Amino acid sequence: MHNWLLPEHIADILPATARQLESAKAAMLERFRRYGYELVSPPLIEYTDSLLTNADPALDMQTFKLDDQLSGRQLGLRADMTPQVARIDAHLLAHRQGVTRLCYAGSVVHTRASGLMRSREPLQVGAELYGCYDLAADIEIIELMLSTLAGVGIDAVTLDLGHLGVYRALVREAQLDGETEQALFAALQAKDRASVEALTADVREPFCSAFRHLVDLYGPEAIGKARARLPGLPGIRAALDDLERLAQIFASRARISFDLTELRGTHYHTGLMFAAYAEGWAEELARGGRYDNVGRRFGRARPATGFSLDLRDMIRVLPQTHPSKGIRVRAADLSRLADEVARLRAAGEVVVVDYLGETAADLHCDRELVCREEGQSLEAAPAHP
């Protein structure tokens, strides 16, 4: 086996791509800052009992684990930064009693790629808002998500909205046992009508029919269908009202669709869920939702809403960036020009020392600092070495 081979779905980032990613990341973080979000940087590795706080089997399966040689405890490489940021809000920023806005950008590592063309080392960028139960907080987060995507040229977006409140209200009122609920959850996720019908055969009405209707409750007209076909439970009415209000607010910014069987993150989220899609993309560009009380394990249960995206997944639409043209200085002249080289670099110029007699183009330079009898001179670089 060649020793330069990397694991599947792991790749090096070369200079041109690295410039694109860093430029886009900086622009996103600056946008977050203008909305009042403060940057935090959690560690790449933590004890698994803090990384895996919500009994989420999917996150557990995605987490690389190893033993700590110092403590003997199990460590995990983070697969998602959201629980880490929730820990920071709940524990390290516990003195803050009002709304806290935090953002982050960093690599996470997955045991398996989440899609055929996706990396196992996503560059996760996201924003979280803590301390506000009101729908206004979700509106701010969705607005920030759409604005962030538009900032990298993705403005023809479909905003897909869902709400766990509908499913959970039905499960609670139908009094399903744990085993049936888990199987029904999987069947609804797969939109497997036959399995849903089999699993709800002994469920009393109106809940039997309601679960079966859920399979069809997706698309632009889903809210109207849901009001007509589902029981008028308070939790369901409130969830549908929220979805309808969000659709009205963002109708001018995105194509709106609904999916009341989109239940990914049910161990993680607690209510509203949303995702952004665009033509030509097989999977979502960004995803988020409400995950109230995620900080309970760290001593402070707080309402929370947020979104995240994988910046590496967007590389094909990110604006091209080009390296700044530099100034070449020949190695033989360096000692005599050292002060001027230092001054130019301090002023923000790129100064490249030519050790091998390369062309200015090879060194990405369009000027040359030369030594002449009458003194130093900054000139246009010749095409030849």
UniProtKB/Swiss-Prot annotation:
This entry's Gene Ontology molecular function terms read: histidine-tRNA ligase activity
Where in or outside the cell it occurs: the entry states: Cytoplasm
Its keywords, alphabetically, are: Amino-acid biosynthesis, Cytoplasm, Histidine biosynthesis
Which SUPFAM superfamilies has this protein been placed in? Class II aaRS and biotin synthetases
* Organism superkingdom: Bacteria
Signal sequence residues: none
Instruction: Choose any GO biological process term that the UniProt entry carries and state it.
Output: L-histidine biosynthetic process
State the Pfam families in the record. Answer: tRNA-synt_His
Q: Which InterPro entries match?
A: aa-tRNA-synth_II/BPL/LPL (IPR045864), HisRS-like_core (IPR041715), HisRS/HisZ (IPR004516), HisZ (IPR004517)
Pathway it belongs to? Answer: Amino-acid biosynthesis; L-histidine biosynthesis; L-histidine from 5-phospho-alpha-D-ribose 1-diphosphate: step 1/9
Q: What is its main location?
A: cytoplasm
**Subunit composition and interactions:** Heteromultimer composed of HisG and HisZ subunits.
Q: Beyond the main fields, what else does the record say?
A: This function is generally fulfilled by the C-terminal part of HisG, which is missing in some bacteria such as this one.
**HAMAP family linked to this entry:** HisZ
What does the UniProt function comment say about this protein?
A: Required for the first step of histidine biosynthesis. May allow the feedback regulation of ATP phosphoribosyltransferase activity by histidine.
Q: Which family would the database say this protein is a member of?
A: Belongs to the class-II aminoacyl-tRNA synthetase family. HisZ subfamily.
Name the UniProt record assigns to this protein: ATP phosphoribosyltransferase regulatory subunit
Q: What organism is this sequence from?
A: Laribacter hongkongensis (strain HLHK9)
